């Protein structure tokens, strides 16, 4: 869910070319790999399922669909070898669910290098968790960790190497660990995602995540129609005034937590 504003446009920017590693095999990872490659960056895609990744490696790219149409986007490297993918990367983008973060951190730790920036989108406080996990695994690399509260895209895979991007975020409030290096991290991330903006430390970034606010009421309060109908869109049919009222109440609690911890506006209410 793109809670921080959205656009149907493109992330096209043929400016500074950067080596970017994208980790994951889901909707967001394929969207990021295609979008960033089309923007002119040298993108390397990793997922642990080598057989599933073979569709991309065999074709040499990803089919990207968005408001501009459908086209093939070449991906410089797609590999199940994490060392190959992250070696030399300036930016490591992880658009994966929180449930995958421990496994990714364990695999990633031996390959991290000084001056790399790891960007979790979304993070759900995984930036700090992965940083401490990597350190516990013995990594001493001087890495900057950053996270925002949402995927940069509303995206859906339509096949083993095809992704449809219907929306792109226009604001990505991002927190950094360690916070004193926030400017350095955001300068790197901003070359890939111009929509990033500073929101303080990494906990502040985690508290921008609208997912825990939006999705539980939608699922719980739509349990009956979800079980009854073959198709039921929780975001349109399921977002009734009563559901929205609960969502708004939860979001006020999120903002109250931010304020209690000393974080100032903007809180980006839903």
Language-model segments: which ranges?
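Rossmann-like NAD(P)-binding element
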Residues: 71-112, 117-119
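NAD(P)+-binding Rossmann beta1-loop-alpha1 motif at the extreme N-terminus of oxidoreductases
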Residues: 13-66
């Amino acid at each position: 869910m793109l809670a921080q504003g959205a656009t149907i446009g493109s992330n096209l920017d043929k400016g500074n070319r950067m080596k970017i590693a994208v980790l994951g095999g889901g909707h967001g990872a394929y969207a990021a790999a295609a979008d960033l490659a089309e923007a002119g960056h040298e993108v390397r895609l990793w997922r642990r399922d080598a057989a599933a990744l073979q569709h991309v490696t065999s074709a040499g790219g990803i089919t990207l669909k968005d408001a501009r149409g459908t086209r093939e986007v070449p991906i410089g490297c797609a590999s199940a070898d994490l060392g190959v993918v992250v070696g030399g990367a300036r930016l490591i983008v992880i658009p994966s669910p929180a449930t995958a973060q421990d496994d990714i951190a364990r695999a990633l730790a031996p390959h991290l290098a000084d001056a790399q920036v790891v960007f979790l989108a979304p993070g759900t406080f995984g930036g700090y968790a992965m940083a401490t996990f990597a350190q516990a695994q013995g990594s001493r690399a001087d890495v900057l960790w950053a996270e925002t509260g949402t995927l940069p895209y509303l995206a859906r895979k339509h096949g083993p190497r095809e992704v449809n991007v219907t929306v792109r975020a226009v604001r990505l409030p991002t927190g950094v660990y360690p916070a004193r290096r926030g400017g350095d991290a955001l300068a790197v991330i901003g070359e890939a995602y111009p929509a990033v903006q500073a929101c303080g430390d990494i906990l502040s970034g985690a508290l921008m995540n609208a997912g825990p606010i939006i999705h539980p009421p939608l699922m719980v309060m739509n349990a009956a129609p979800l079980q009854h109908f073959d198709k039921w869109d929780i975001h349109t049919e399921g977002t009734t005034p009563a559901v929205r009222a609960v969502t708004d109440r939860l979001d006020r609690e999120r903002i109250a937590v931010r304020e209690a911890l000393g974080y100032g506006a903007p809180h980006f209410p839903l």
